[in-house]
Amino acid sequence: MTARGPEFRDVMAHLNSGLRNAFNLAPSEPVRGVQSWSGDDDYKVVVVSGSGTAAMEMVIANRFRSNDLVLVPTNGKFGERVAEMCQRFCNVKHLKYDWGRAFDLYELERQLERGCYESLLICHNETSTGITQDAAAIAEMCARHNTSFILDGITSVGGMPVHPTEWKAEAVVVGAQKCTAGPSGIAAIAINSNFIERVHAIRDQGDSNPNY
C-alpha cells in the first residue's frame, strides 16, 4: 500500500469519518473522493503524524501571533506543558493552581472581563492529578467575553463528553493512544472555520510563527 494509492485513500476516508464521530461532530461519508474530513457543521478534522503534544504545538504555532496574549490556567503537568508551548509562540498569562486543585471559575471570569485575551487554552482531563476541568462552563465564559476557546482533549475525547460545536471550541486535540485505544504517535485535531480564517489571515499578513 502506498501513501498515494487508492487503498490508502480509502483508509483515510474511513479514518476521517470515524474521527468525526469520536469528536461528536456531524457525520461524513467514509468514501474516497469526497471531503470525508468535513461534515454538515463548521468543523474539519486533521490527522497528525505525531504525538498529541505535537498536535497541540501545531495548533498554538499556527493560531497565534507573537504579540497575542492568551490565558492558560493549569493544575498539573500537562496543562503546564500547554503553557510552556504557548510561551514559545505568544504571550501568556499563566494561572498556576496547586496540582490537584480545581480551577477557580470566578477568577477565570474576572480575567476574561479584562478583554485582553485572544484565547483561553486548557487541558481538559489532567491525568497527572486526576482532575477534569468544567469545559462547558469555561467555554460559556469564553463565548460571553469574545475569547476563543482551545481544548487539549488528548485524554478526554472518546472517553467522556466532549462537544466542540456546543462549546464553540476553535480547536480540540486528541491522542490516538488514549481513550480511542489506538497506536501512539498519531493524533488528530478538530478545527472550525474561525481557526482556519485566523491562520490564513496571520500568514497573509506576514505575522506567522514558524508553522507546520
Feature annotation, model-predicted:
Residues 78-80, 101, 156-158, 178-182, ...:
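Short gly/pro/ser/thr-enriched loop/turn and capping motifs at secondary-structure boundaries
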Residues 103-156, 171, 179:
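Active-site phosphate-binding strand-loop segment of PLP-dependent enzymes
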Residues 46-49, 72, 94-96, 121-122, ...:
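General beta-strand structural signal in soluble alpha/beta enzymes
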Residues 54, 62-118:
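PLP-dependent aminotransferase-like
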Residues 177-212:
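Active-site C-terminal subdomain of aminotransferase-like
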Residues 1-58, 77, 81-85:
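Conserved N-terminal alpha-helix of the aminotransferase class I/II PLP-enzyme fold
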Residues 164-177:
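Conserved active-site segment immediately N-terminal to the catalytic lysine
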